[in-house]
């Protein structure tokens, strides 16, 4: 533990909080272009084929992996999409979500509940 004299000479530094979605550069969403659309498997207790896309963020150039939520999608290489922050707990390295129903990403078909999260208009 430091003495009072040591604290007077060099005060304590406050820790800066860690940014969980640095590629968004403090923006709520960013436009991006799909580089590769593929499936991957989750961590140990879970088993599935999760749909993800490697995307290049417009005007920034960094490539990140983004999750494609919902059942079925129409994304392919060169699709222009909108991404938001939000990790997927069982997929390491996936820290972004693709927003369904925005730009080239179509909303989920036949979705009745939680429609706003999947870009579906009221039928």
Curated annotation (Swiss-Prot):
Subunit annotation: Part of the 30S ribosomal subunit. Contacts proteins S8 and S17. May interact with IF1 in the 30S initiation complex.
Keywords: Methylation, Ribonucleoprotein, Ribosomal protein, RNA-binding, rRNA-binding, tRNA-binding
Protein's GO biological process: translation
GO MF terms, alphabetically ordered: rRNA binding; structural constituent of ribosome; tRNA binding
Region (Disordered): 1-26
Any one cellular-component term (Gene Ontology): small ribosomal subunit
Pfam families from the UniProt entry: Ribosom_S12_S23
Protein name: Small ribosomal subunit protein uS12
Modified residues (3-methylthioaspartic acid): 90
Its job: With S4 and S5 plays an important role in translational accuracy.
Family (UniProt): Belongs to the universal ribosomal protein uS12 family.
SUPFAM superfamilies in the cross-refs: Nucleic acid-binding proteins
Domain of life: Bacteria
Species: Ehrlichia chaffeensis (strain ATCC CRL-10679 / Arkansas)
Ribonucleoprotein in keyword set: yes
InterPro entries membership: NA-bd_OB-fold, Ribosomal_uS12, Ribosomal_uS12_bac
């Amino acid at each position: 533990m430091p003495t009072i004299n040591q604290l007077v000479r060099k005060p304590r530094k406050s820790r800066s909080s860690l940014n969980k979605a640095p590629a968004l550069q403090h923006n709520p969403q960013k436009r991006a272009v799909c580089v590769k659309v593929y499936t991957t498997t989750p961590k140990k207790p879970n088993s599935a084929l999760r749909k993800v896309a490697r995307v290049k963020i417009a005007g920034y150039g960094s490539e990140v992996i983004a999750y494609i939520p919902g059942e079925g999608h129409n994304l392919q290489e060169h699709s222009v999409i909108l991404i938001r922050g939000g990790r997927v707990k069982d997929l390491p390295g996936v820290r972004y979500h693709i927003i369904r129903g925005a730009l080239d990403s179509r909303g989920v078909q036949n979705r009745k509940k939680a429609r706003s999260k999947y870009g579906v208009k009221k039928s």
